[in-house]
């Protein structure tokens, strides 16, 4: 499959690719070795597969798997298993999967600040927060704030599930970004949350806090500066059932500034909207 996707023009599989109407190589960048695999057998096999692939395709980035469950304390760094790999230096990107509750997700708002640097890049390949809508969606955003605040981990994030058919929504814990039918599809609130994070990125993280936060542990905030657009971006998530008046504390502003607000308003009980 790799040779078919990016091999040179002299090989059999590239000839097949051209024959199928795609003479140019596909933009393959990453290969994940395994899926939710871990333990001594996997650590050994990862090294063998890594050596075979990286020798032939040195420009690709290889992703390793982590333990599925959270071991020990809820905020344990799953990457503590990296030293158990045959050659830890060959673990360039580490895939972490999380399935947990709304309460757990809110507790992880500062999770990645505590990660050891200089190890492997961070990849959240699967994230599923179960619980009552829309709090599960908002709690997902609280974790995403922690991911984007820690850009020095070179984080990657994969949205899932991307799409699900109307007929298979019943009893599903994790809702998709898109719901499709025979001739149409609908964007869900999960899609719009992802879009808001995508459309409002920053490359410089700044300190921000909410004044008088005592008793308001369901409010989450993060802030940064986008050097490309020269804009300051402040993000707020409110998991409460009511509107609240907040006074953000942001250092560095000497005078009032104009601001543009983008809101995602969610209605309890309307999961598929």
Region spans (language model):
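Composition- and surface-driven signal marking solvent-exposed, interaction-prone regions
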Residues: 108, 135-137, 172, 179-180, ...
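Conserved, mostly hydrophobic/aromatic
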Residues: 1, 31, 94, 157, ...
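Carbohydrate-binding surface patches
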Residues: 217-257
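Short helix/loop capping segments that flank catalytic or ligand/cofactor-binding pockets
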Residues: 41-42, 133, 167-168, 244-245
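Active-site proximal loops enriched in glycine and acidic residues that flank catalytic Cys/His/Asp
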Residues: 35, 66, 98, 126, ...
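Active-site neighborhood of glycoside hydrolase catalytic domains
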Residues: 4-13, 19-154
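Acidic, Ser/Thr/Pro-rich beta/coil linker or hinge segments at domain junctions
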Residues: 253-273
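Aromatic/acidic polysaccharide-binding cleft in carbohydrate-active enzymes
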Residues: 119-223, 227-230
């Amino acid at each position: 499959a790799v040779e078919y996707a990016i091999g040179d023009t002299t090989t059999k599989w590239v000839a097949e690719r051209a024959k199928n109407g795609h003479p140019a190589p596909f933009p393959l960048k990453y290969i994940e070795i395994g899926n939710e695999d871990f333990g001594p057998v996997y650590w050994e096999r990862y090294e063998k597969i890594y050596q075979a692939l990286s020798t032939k395709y040195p420009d690709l980035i290889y992703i390793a798997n982590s333990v599925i469950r959270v071991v020990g304390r809820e905020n344990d760094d799953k990457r503590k298993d990296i030293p158990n790999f045959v050659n830890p230096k060959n673990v360039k990107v580490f895939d972490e999967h999380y399935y947990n509750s709304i309460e757990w997700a809110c507790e992880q708002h500062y999770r990645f600040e505590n990660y050891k640097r200089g190890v492997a890049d961070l990849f959240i390949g699967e994230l599923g927060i179960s619980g009552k809508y829309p709090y599960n969606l908002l709690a997902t955003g609280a974790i995403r704030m922690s991911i984007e605040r820690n850009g020095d981990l070179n984080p990657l994030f994969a949205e899932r599930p991307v799409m699900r058919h109307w007929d298979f929504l019943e009893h599903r814990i994790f809702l998709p970004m898109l719901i499709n039918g025979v001739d149409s599809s609908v964007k869900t609130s999960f899609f719009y949350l992802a879009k808001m994070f995508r459309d409002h990125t920053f490359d410089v993280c700044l300190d921000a806090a909410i004044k008088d936060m005592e008793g308001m542990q369901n409010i989450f905030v993060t802030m940064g500066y986008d050097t490309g657009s020269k804009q300051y971006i402040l993000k707020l998530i409110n998991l409460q059932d009511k509107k609240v008046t907040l006074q953000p504390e942001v250092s560095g502003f000497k005078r009032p500034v104009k601001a543009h607000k983008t809101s995602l308003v969610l209605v309890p009980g309307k999961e598929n909207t």
